[in-house]
């Protein structure tokens, strides 16, 4: 404190910056070294393990009021968060549907946090990079240059963006001004009975309600039945509803089924409906040379939701919404209060990216995607997608070759459902396979999930993992059989 401050009774000014930059630089080197080791040795650790009580108890500690040395803070993080992860970066994590991250993307997230830009808008390099990554997503899916898009938290939000534009375009009234109560005829949205639960949330958030989303039956391959969809549209019009939007699945969450996107695009055009594609699982198959044909027609969509944090393996979180009609996209979200007006030059002369979504403050999500794409090139990511799809076919072959394993159906892309079947049925069979799944997790062998397909209970493997190898799948098949026999012998289930 200088003499003037002291004489005025002023407190010394503080900052969150380190008091010793050399010391924090050396400590940061240690953290980076630990991070490299953490990834390099990922295969040597269990996929997942249960936290002991003393670890859980640490997260009930009260709010800290006084300082703690950074080394102590980092030590606590190492013993807790880093030691008990979800496990999705592990080569044998196939539960739910998650990417496995990548080191370059992690560096991008670190640099984005250091640089600290707010991507709500403005004239700065991060904003331009955000736009460039959106443009790259358009190129990957064959969208026109004139289309727009926005990076968001993930697939659920990307779907909400697309469906909000669809609602406003098809409402026939100014929904932003008058609300959904001003819509003359109730809107109808359509998707298959395999549609992701986020679409229900979207309907509720948009004020339309769950009943506005009509679930259409699927065929034997769990793809939307086009004839049933057409009949539902006719029926709804006759009943006084206004068909507004059809949602096509580029990969369903249960089995990876891909709707006939070309047929849906044609039907939507003929019926005057908005065509939205939920591509959070499979849109990026468009860059995979051996499998791109599976999502043909996605380039005709009015809007698409996709997830770079899945098959581009970006660190969580980053999704992307693309909208063909850029003007409609901006009309749906743009607000220009006096404190966010553009200027002819200076910081506020750049585009306001918040005009394309719900967030005003936005994190710098683009950098982790940009760096990984620049380092590896999009062709490598396409090959990795083909690799995962081939690995699932390999696993399906192992399942078919083992008499005690049963395959639900031939896989479409990178998801396979199967179960251990020693001659049980109903709840006993479900209990056995659930126990197999839990022991695989608890013993740190592999992370699987389970689901219901055609009314039956199945184990589910979703390979969105650039670290998975065929040896891992050999191990999985062996361990499922071993555990199935072990549990049956122990008498934990009965027919």
Predicted regions and their residues:
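Short, glycine-/Ser/Thr-/acidic-enriched flexible segments
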Residues: 194-196, 220-221, 251-253, 282, ...
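PLP-dependent enzyme catalytic core of the Aspartate aminotransferase-like
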Residues: 453-495
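N-terminal entrance/gating region of PLP-dependent enzymes' catalytic architecture
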Residues: 2-3, 7-146, 438-446, 468, ...
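Conserved PLP-enzyme active-site core in the AAT-like
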Residues: 125, 158-330
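Short loop-beta-helix segment that forms the pyridoxal 5′-phosphate
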Residues: 137-165, 214-217
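Active-site C-terminal subdomain of aminotransferase-like
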Residues: 296-403
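Conserved PLP-binding catalytic core of the aspartate aminotransferase-like
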Residues: 407-440
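Short beta-strand
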Residues: 406-411, 448-453
